[in-house]
Swiss-Prot record:
The lineage of its organism: Viruses, Riboviria, Orthornavirae, Negarnaviricota, Haploviricotina. Interacts with host importins KPNA1, KPNA5 and KPNA6. Interacts with host STAT1. Interacts with host KEAP1; this interaction activates host transcription factor NRF2 by blocking its interaction with KEAP1. It comes from Zaire ebolavirus (strain Kikwit-95) (ZEBOV). Belongs to the filoviridae membrane-associated protein VP24 family. This is Membrane-associated protein VP24. One of its GO terms (cellular component) is host cell plasma membrane. Disulfide bonds: none annotated. GO terms for biological process: symbiont-mediated suppression of host innate immune response; viral process.
Length: 251
């Protein structure tokens, strides 16, 4: 039976570029230096990454901190008092958040192959390396990943960023303040703080939290401003009050 197609319909290249993402966008983490930090381009999204908060992390880790900050240090002993923990750059924190957003899609949706496999590889690349380019060798993946699929991936990443924005700052009232995602080789924990998002990467068994024999952990801080441009609404009054209540948090 003959079927109708839109094979020769004219499209607006500019409009398609604005809405769509190509595979190379997912496989390139392009970084350029700015006065305050870096500009990062990934999946058709431009992020402004700043150094803000990193000096505080270093001081908390090296015991060079004001007494009023001890609450923050004691809240995360597996990071600040662990000889096996290391501080990474904010660029690393962004990579981990993006990898977590991809993993979140893999967990929540029944994605077909080769899309699921391709996303898993891209997530591992972001999570375990600091290289700017990932070479996707599989031609089958390139052929089957449509513009619509790639745009959906970007859309889901932006939804994940909004989920992070909806978290409450760490507090004593039991409100949700962290997102935790486990992969085969890692545990990712992203926690909302006054200054932004404290990002940590641990072993799958979270051995870093073992007080007697703490395992390895990597962590960093991504400032609030980096993700704020992609969130849908301003903080609610409740969030603002909690931010104020927790102003004694060093970060």
């Amino acid at each position: 039976m003959a079927k109708a197609t839109g094979r020769y319909n004219l499209i607006s290249p500019k409009k398609d570029l604005e809405k769509g993402v190509v595979l190379s966008d997912l496989c390139n983490f392009l970084v350029s230096q700015t006065i305050q930090g870096w500009k990062v381009y990934w999946a058709g999204i431009e992020f402004d990454v700043t150094h803000k908060g990193m000096a505080l992390l270093q001081r908390l880790k090296t015991n060079d901190f004001a007494p009023a900050w001890s609450m923050t240090r004691n809240l995360f002993p597996h990071l600040f008092q662990n000889p096996n923990s290391t501080i990474e750059s904010p660029l690393w924190a962004l990579r981990v958040i993006l990898a977590a957003g991809i993993q979140d899609q893999l967990i929540d949706q029944s994605l077909i192959e080769p899309l699921a496999g391709a996303l898993g590889l891209i997530s591992d690349w972001l999570l375990t390396t600091n290289t700017n380019h990932f070479n996707m060798r599989t031609q089958r993946v390139k052929e089957q990943l449509s513009l619509k699929m790639l745009s959906l991936i970007r859309s889901n990443i932006l939804k994940f960023i909004n989920r992070l924005d909806a978290l409450h700052v760490v507090n004593y009232n039991g409100l949700l303040s962290s997102i935790e995602i486990g992969t085969q080789n890692h545990t990712i924990i992203i926690t909302r703080t006054n200054m932004g998002f404290l990002v940590e990467l641990q072993e799958p068994d979270k051995s870093a939290m073992n007080r007697k024999k703490p395992g390895p952990a990597k962590f960093s801080l991504l400032h609030e401003s980096t993700l704020k441009a992609f969130t849908q609404g301003s903080s609610t009054r409740m969030q603002s009050l909690i931010l104020e209540f927790n102003s004694s948090l060093a970060i």
